[in-house]
């Protein structure tokens, strides 16, 4: 490591103040920070000695995403091969999935990081590690055969509008990854819905049936998958959203490390379950009659409530606010699924909606606490007098 440190120090000289490449220092600083812990410290304000910085927090989330990502690779190949009736092995499925998914990840990182670097140089501030997670999340929540140019445009929109327009990492109101998906959904709806977008190379296969479970229910069809299949994720869907089992592995890591809020996750499940049970009692259509516990297993609910709703920037910040925020995400997710037949998956819109209301929730939670303390103080003052 000492050898690498010395080489980096040699490369650093042209980028320091007064050097020929001074304006590109933020880009070099990002490279240096990726290799070593930053050597700068705060000069004023509160000082907290902690071994966890933004980079390590982002890496923790990426590690939590890996199980769902690798299963997504397998499921991509699995869904393709079972439609073609070609004999295949586990490794055949994984290789096909990797062949389809890795270019999407590469495009997402290349385009997104290029914009991040450009803004860092323009604003003369360090490149933050926030996009490390966003750049992986975006391709994981997209259909497998989404054209790469379309993915690139969605990334550009998300980074510019949902992130940089608000000031960059830590300042965004909306979740950037979900903003990218929302843009793609409304700008290119034919590539985001239907029975041809969820299975790799579906347009080249005659008679394919790749409709998602929620899409089938929205059309009053019968579901051909068991709850076990839904839980494990061997069903059509977005790249890495289908397996609840592997999402829960990531959720466990986020909870243990304290990176993800278990309050938001649990309250989201409670909210969705309550509304799902009420609709089961009503049972007016296929989506209402769909078992409440299966609502938790299909679509992007598990992935969204674990990795999207818990975004520490766009989610509620107060303890009570997290319970309210998560509960309402679950409630609106099921409501949108049931009452919006044109878009049976509701978790994306539910989370984005609650992102907008998260500051308001925190505001009233804080105001409520201040009011309670004021009344308590006034009561204590009266007793002493």
PLM segments and residue spans:
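Structural signature of hydrophobic alpha-helical transmembrane segments
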Residues: 94-110, 145-154, 230-244, 289-301
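Long hydrophobic alpha-helical segments that form multi-pass transmembrane helix bundles
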Residues: 170-248
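C-terminal ends of transmembrane helices
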Residues: 42-48, 112-123, 160-170, 249-257, ...
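Loop-to-transmembrane alpha-helix initiation sites
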Residues: 152, 173-178, 292-299, 322, ...
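Hydrophobic, membrane-inserted alpha-helices
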Residues: 111-116, 131-140, 155-162, 246-254, ...
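A beta-strand-loop signature enriched in Asp, Gly, Thr, and Trp
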Residues: 265-270, 274-319
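Membrane-interface helix-loop-helix junctions at boundaries between adjacent transmembrane segments
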Residues: 126-205
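N-terminal signal-anchor module of multipass membrane proteins
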Residues: 1-105, 384-385
């Amino acid at each position: 490591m000492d050898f690498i440190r010395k080489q980096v120090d040699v490369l650093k000289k042209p980028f320091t103040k007064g050097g020929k490449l001074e304006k590109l220092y933020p880009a070099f600083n990002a490279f240096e920070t990726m290799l070593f812990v930053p050597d700068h410290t705060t000069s004023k304000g509160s000082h907290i000695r902690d071994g966890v910085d933004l980079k390590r927090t982002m890496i923790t989330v990426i590690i939590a995403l890996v199980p769902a990502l690798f299963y997504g690779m397998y499921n991509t190949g699995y869904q393709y091969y079972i439609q073609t009736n070609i004999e295949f092995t586990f490794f055949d499925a994984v290789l096909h999935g990797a062949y389809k998914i890795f270019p999407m990840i590469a495009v997402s990182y290349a385009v997104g990081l290029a914009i991040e670097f450009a803004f860092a140089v323009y604003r003369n501030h360090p490149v933050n590690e926030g996009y490390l997670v966003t750049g992986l999340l975006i391709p994981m929540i997209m259909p497998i055969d989404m054209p790469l140019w379309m993915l690139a445009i969605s990334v550009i929109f998300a980074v510019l509008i949902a992130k940089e327009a608000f000031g960059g990492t830590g300042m965004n109101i909306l979740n950037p990854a979900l903003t990218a998906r929302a843009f793609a959904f409304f700008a290119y709806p034919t590539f985001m819905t239907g029975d041809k977008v969820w299975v790799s190379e579906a347009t080249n296969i005659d008679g394919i049936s790749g409709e998602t479970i929620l899409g089938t229910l929205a059309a009053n069809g019968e579901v051909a998958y068991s709850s076990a299949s839904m839980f494990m994720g061997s069903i059509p869907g977005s790249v890495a959203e289908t397996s609840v089992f592997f999402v829960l592995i990531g959720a466990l890591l986020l909870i243990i490390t304290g990176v993800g809020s278990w309050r938001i996750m649990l309250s989201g499940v409670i909210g969705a379950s309550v509304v799902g049970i009420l609709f089961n009692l009503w049972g007016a259509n296929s989506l209402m009659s769909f078992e409440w516990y299966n609502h938790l297993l299909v679509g992007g609910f598990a992935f969204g409530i674990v990795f999207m709703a818990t975004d520490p920037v766009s989610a509620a910040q107060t303890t009570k606010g997290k319970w309210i925020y998560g509960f309402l995400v679950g409630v609106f997710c099921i409501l949108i699924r049931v009452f919006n037949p044109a878009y049976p998956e509701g978790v994306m819109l539910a989370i984005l909606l609650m992102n907008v209301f998260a500051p308001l929730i925190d505001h009233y939670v804080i105001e409520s606490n201040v009011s309670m303390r004021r009344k308590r103080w006034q009561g204590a003052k009266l007793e002493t007098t």
